[in-house]
Amino acid sequence: MMFATNFFVTSIILLFILIFLASAIKIVKEYERAVIFRLGRVVGARGPGLFFIIPIFEKAVIVDLRTQVLDVPVQETITKDNVPVRVNAVVYFRVVDPVKAVTQVKNYIMATSQISQTTLRSVIGQAHLDELLSERDKLNMQLQRIIDEATDPWGIKVTAVEIKDVELPAGMQKAMARQAEAERERRARITLAEAERQAAEKLREAAEIISEHPMALQLRTLQTISDVAGDKSNVIVLMLPMEMLKLFKSLSDAAEAYMKKKEEEK
């Protein structure tokens, strides 16, 4: 009976020793750090790897050092030019000081989320709609700087902030669509006017050449007649000016004189 009692007590003691040792051994991954509290007072961060703590007297709080992605929910706000918009964003951040992340704020993830929401509303409220639509990179940098400064006391580093979606009222979307259509029509008219101007310029240059060289017009007329006559299905009726007839006669006389000269040489 005594042996059984001693065995039971020994087993209980060994069990407590094993539990004690198991709770004293801590293994921290490469991307983690353990913030150690001894009797309620922080003594520093440990890791990565294997280390021991004193159970009951010491406590380890594990902090992830990897970059985390935080979705900022949709925020309803009004731009500087009084346009109501719905905007959401995404924040990339990581813990650079695990001790501050544990001791300076109760929940650093929730705190970063709240700061991001209020900052997003504030920055959008100070921007015009055109900036929100066309200068998003500038606003992203501004958001990143402000949120990073606000979370720095918590040991947080904000690496990037990106505005994801911008929702406009239906009426504003229709108005912008009409404006875009009007802008496309304006550019089309400008392009057409420029083409007409260039065509008019070419015609003016051609008119100047013809006025300086009347024979050029007659040669051009002959070329046109030759091109049209190439199609045998066409019936051509020409009303030639006297100048053109004179040109034909001069060409005929020149050809006849040339033939006579050849015959005389023979």
Curated annotation (Swiss-Prot):
Transmembrane segments: 7-27
Membrane topology according to the record: Single-pass membrane protein
Protein's UniProt keywords contain Coiled coil: yes
Chain segments annotated as coiled-coil in the UniProt record: 125-152, 178-213
Membrane found in the keyword field: yes
GO cellular component: plasma membrane
Pfam families xrefs: Band_7
Quaternary structure, from the entry: Homotrimer. Interacts with PH1510 and is cleaved by PH1510.
Protein name as catalogued: Stomatin homolog PH1511
